[in-house]
Amino acid sequence: MELELWQFAVLFAAAFFGGFIDSIAGGGGLISLPALLAVGVPPHVAIATNRFQGSFGSFTAALNFIRKGYVDAAEILRGVIFTFVGGLVGAYVLLLIDAKFLNYLIPILLLALLFYMIFSPNLGEAPAKSKMSKKSFYAIFGLVLGFYDGFFGPGTGSFWTFALVGILGLYMKKAVAHTKVLNFTSNIVSLGVFIIGGQSLWLVGAVMAVGQIAGSFAGSSLVMRCDVKFVRKMLLFVVAATILKLLYGLIAS
């Protein structure tokens, strides 16, 4: 598939802004995936290419957070392992069954999450008491959310951040940092499945990857400088946008 120069420019810009938003609150795919579809990339190829370029963004954001000390490597290692396993199983199951039923379930779960955050205005502003041991948390949520990301995907970052803040008691910035590491883990697994299937546009993916790297670095750097309330507002915005996108897909179909 051949694209014109202006189309590459549009995709680069979409990847930059997608990476910027995603590194703060997740949901970057709400920008990058529609851009790929808008320039005529077939849906299955667009999904694979979006995973490819998005992996560079999540890696850049995760690395930036790790370098600045926002990630506890010893704590999150268990989560990485179980997320990897969950993502692998989810990506494999996706090849066997249809994920359409999740189009009905996920908006309901995200709506519940949205209202909980709205009525918990101080959530994530400071570390809180954990409601579950770290070992159990990372084992259970690593498998569940890793599987979900490999199988379906939308809202994974929001679910991770909410769980890390609401259940494990992390403050918002650290939760966002840990989310990026865990997101990258499940992204890279499902990406591997798509690569094996040969469904990615490499040149398009490479151009968008550059935009993702730049946007993700800018966004993750902003998270470390800005007020927690800003991160929370961005998270609320992304959750609401994801709900609307999924509901629109249901109505349109």
Regions found by a protein language model. Give the residues of each.
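Selected transmembrane alpha-helices and immediately adjacent juxtamembrane segments
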Residues: 1-42, 127-176, 206
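Residues within membrane-spanning alpha-helices of integral membrane proteins
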Residues: 8, 51, 107-110, 114, ...
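Transmembrane helix-loop junction
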Residues: 38-39, 45, 91, 95, ...
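Membrane-interface alpha-helices at helix entry/exit sites of multi-pass transporters
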Residues: 41-50, 73-78, 169-180
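Selective hydrophobic functional segments
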Residues: 48-101, 187-237
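Transmembrane helix exit motif
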Residues: 60-70, 99, 107-131, 241-253
